Amino acid sequence: MDATTTAKRKRPAASDIADDAPTTVDEVSDAEVEEFYAILRRMRDATRRLGARPPPPRAPAWRPSFSWEDFADAPPKQAPPPPQQPADHERVAENATPPRRPAPGLDLNVEPPSDAPATPRSARAPA
């Protein structure tokens, strides 16, 4: 390859790109900053509350105990009674979809319960 093709492939310098791009600074209100830190506090409180639980105790190992009666032949079962036809309103209820319940999980828009210890805020000078 000659020098002209390699010169075309070079990337422009970073300083050239920075001069062309306009720089914008978004002004953020104190309320937005407080809301952001409130969300962070709720996340930290939730992880401490949900993640700090000790593991549940293990169930003891199952140790079956058998007796000779367990292996005896079972008496013959009686035939079940014929099924009854449900009423029309029961059929509708049977085919209806159950109401949706919200999935349990972490909702950062909900304030933590009042019985949980509050996370102390750091004391910082007002701006």
From Swiss-Prot:
<feature type="region of interest" description="Disordered">
    <location>
        <begin position="1"/>
        <end position="28"/>
    </location>
</feature>
<keyword id="KW-0539">Nucleus</keyword>
<dbReference type="InterPro" id="IPR031425">
    <property type="entry name" value="NPR1/NH1-interacting"/>
</dbReference>
<feature type="region of interest" description="Disordered">
    <location>
        <begin position="47"/>
        <end position="127"/>
    </location>
</feature>
<comment type="subunit">
    <text>Interacts with NPR1/NH1. Interacts with NPR3/NH3.</text>
</comment>
<protein>
    <recommendedName>
        <fullName>Protein NEGATIVE REGULATOR OF RESISTANCE</fullName>
    </recommendedName>
</protein>
<dbReference type="GO" id="GO:0042742">
    <property type="term" value="P:defense response to bacterium"/>
</dbReference>
<comment type="function">
    <text>Acts as a negative regulator of disease resistance. Acts on basal resistance, age-related resistance and resistance mediated by the LRR receptor kinase XA21. Plants over-expressing NRR display enhanced susceptibility to the bacterial blight Xanthomonas oryzae pv. oryzae (Xoo). Binds to and represses NPR1/NH1-mediated transcriptional activation of LG2 in vitro.</text>
</comment>
<dbReference type="GO" id="GO:0005634">
    <property type="term" value="C:nucleus"/>
</dbReference>
<keyword id="KW-0611">Plant defense</keyword>
<comment type="similarity">
    <text>Belongs to the NPR1-interactor family.</text>
</comment>
<dbReference type="GO" id="GO:0010112">
    <property type="term" value="P:regulation of systemic acquired resistance"/>
</dbReference>
<feature type="compositionally biased region" description="Low complexity">
    <location>
        <begin position="112"/>
        <end position="127"/>
    </location>
</feature>
